[in-house]
């Protein structure tokens, strides 16, 4: 039986060349809007395997040189698939972690005795307890330290990192507010390990992700932006459409302290690793005509013209040749001969998607209808809802299908 089919159900298939270019030149062309090196994969599993490959190579290179491999590790859920892959390789005896030193990227503060919220426990449960990292090589920020000793504790953490020769790699996730580790919006690029107040957005995420009724503490102790940027290499992972908006800002927008992850743009060896869902709003995926030549399917042409209408605030039938040329769509003029021809074609296509018979109208000419007339009635399967279903009136569509006697 084939499992995990949900990740393979795709309504908008992205051409492979947009996310997996064959050459460095092709990558340079399609990624020119991106300010951090970004690798896009068809699935989370492929992306996690890619990151694990890089970590494995680093660990083995350090082993050959008789050195420690020093890692800063986040505990967010986006890293679980990477940790699972590393554990799998350890279990298959292809990788040892005996030379690895781990520094936890952040910890909640203050913690109550026997708290279930400790991020280091999450790291151990998911990863460290399943591999051969020496216990004495695992370090974490102290969520129990007295308030008057917090600053000294943070300075000691920085010193311990330096004692091991600095960070070789930082593995990070990203929050909805663009936070990395627990660096909230407003964190400066020079910030070191410190105490920080947890923001409302981060608190909501934490409360949703923690499998406990225990109250999230008000603060965190976190590696600072400067601490993370001191790593020789950095990998930032994100999966799924819910991360698409923030990843577009992190990768393509300007650096700002309101988006801490954007500081990774200053690092020469920072890598963003995401799946197609999280890459959805990147220019090369959502608006590929702005960065490369396209194979123009009807669907892509419709997407381009709807985008152009929204950008210019014009109805489709009023778009001109100049509008096309000045907005990266000159290829469509060559394809259709003129803006007028393209406008009429796509206007008619869009018009024919509107119907009061979503299952097809029986005993009617279906030449220009979006759904065929036969067979009737049809058997209709509705998969799990999407956040945008209310916008496209999916509830009304389902109701109409039932009213028109389809087997829903």
Roles of regions detected by a PLM:
Residues 65-92:
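Glycine-rich N-terminal segment of FAD-binding domains in flavoprotein oxidoreductases
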Residues 99-107, 238, 271-276, 408:
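Short internal beta-strands
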Residues 181-225:
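Class I SAM-dependent methyltransferase SAM-binding "motif I" and its flanking Rossmann-like core
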Residues 2-70, 365-369, 374:
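N-terminal glycine-/serine-/threonine-rich phosphate-binding loop
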Residues 22-35, 95-169, 295:
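Ligand-binding beta-strand-loop-alpha-helix segment within the catalytic cores
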Residues 326-408:
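Active-site rim/loop-helix segments in enzyme catalytic domains that contact anionic ligands
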Residues 73-78, 172-176, 239:
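Glycine-rich beta-strand-to-loop/alpha-helix junction loops that act as flexible
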Residues 2-10, 25, 226, 232-332:
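ATP/nucleoside-binding phosphotransfer catalytic cores, i.e., glycine-rich phosphate-binding loops
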């Amino acid at each position: 039986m084939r499992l995990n089919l949900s990740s393979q159900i795709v309504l908008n298939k992205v051409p492979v060349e947009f996310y997996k270019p064959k050459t460095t030149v092709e990558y340079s062309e399609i990624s020119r809007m991106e300010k951090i090196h970004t690798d896009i994969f068809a699935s989370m599993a492929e992306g996690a395997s890619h990151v694990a490959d890089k970590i494995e190579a680093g660990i083995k290179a350090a082993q050959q040189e008789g050195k420690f491999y020093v890692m800063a590790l986040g505990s967010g859920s986006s890293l679980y698939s990477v940790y699972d892959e590393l554990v799998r390789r350890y279990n298959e005896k292809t990788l040892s972690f005996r030379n690895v030193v781990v520094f936890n990227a952040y910890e909640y503060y203050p913690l109550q005795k026997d708290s279930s919220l400790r991020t280091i426990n999450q790291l151990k449960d998911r990863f460290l307890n399943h591999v051969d990292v020496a216990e004495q090589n695992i370090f974490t920020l102290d969520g129990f330290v007295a308030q008057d000793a917090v600053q000294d504790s943070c300075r000691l953490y920085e010193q311990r990192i330096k004692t091991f020769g600095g960070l070789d790699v930082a593995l990070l996730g990203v929050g909805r507010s663009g936070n990395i580790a627990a660096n909230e919006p407003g964190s400066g690029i020079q910030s070191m390990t410190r105490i920080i107040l947890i923001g409302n957005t981060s608190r909501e995420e934490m409360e949703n992700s923690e499998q406990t009724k225990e109250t999230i503490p008000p603060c965190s102790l976190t590696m600072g932006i400067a601490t993370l940027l001191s790593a020789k290499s950095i990998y930032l992972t994100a999966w799924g459409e819910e991360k698409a908006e923030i990843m577009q800002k992190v990768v393509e927008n300007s650096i700002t302290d309101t988006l801490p992850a954007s500081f990774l743009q200053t690092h020469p060896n920072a890598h963003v690793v995401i799946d197609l869902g999280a890459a959805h709003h990147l220019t090369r995926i959502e608006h590929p005509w702005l960065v490369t030549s396209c194979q123009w399917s009807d669907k892509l042409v419709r997407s381009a013209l709807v985008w152009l209408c929204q950008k210019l605030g014009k109805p489709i039938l009023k778009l001109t040749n100049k509008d096309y040329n000045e907005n990266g769509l000159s290829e469509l003029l060559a394809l259709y001969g003129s803006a007028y021809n393209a406008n009429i074609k796509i206007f008619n296509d869009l018009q024919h998607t509107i119907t009061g018979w979503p299952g097809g109208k029986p005993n009617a000419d279906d030449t220009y209808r979006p759904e065929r007339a036969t067979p009737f009635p049809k058997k209709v399967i509705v998969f799990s809802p999407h956040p945008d279903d209310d916008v496209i009136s999916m509830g009304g569509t389902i109701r109409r299908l039932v009213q028109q006697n389809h087997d829903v």
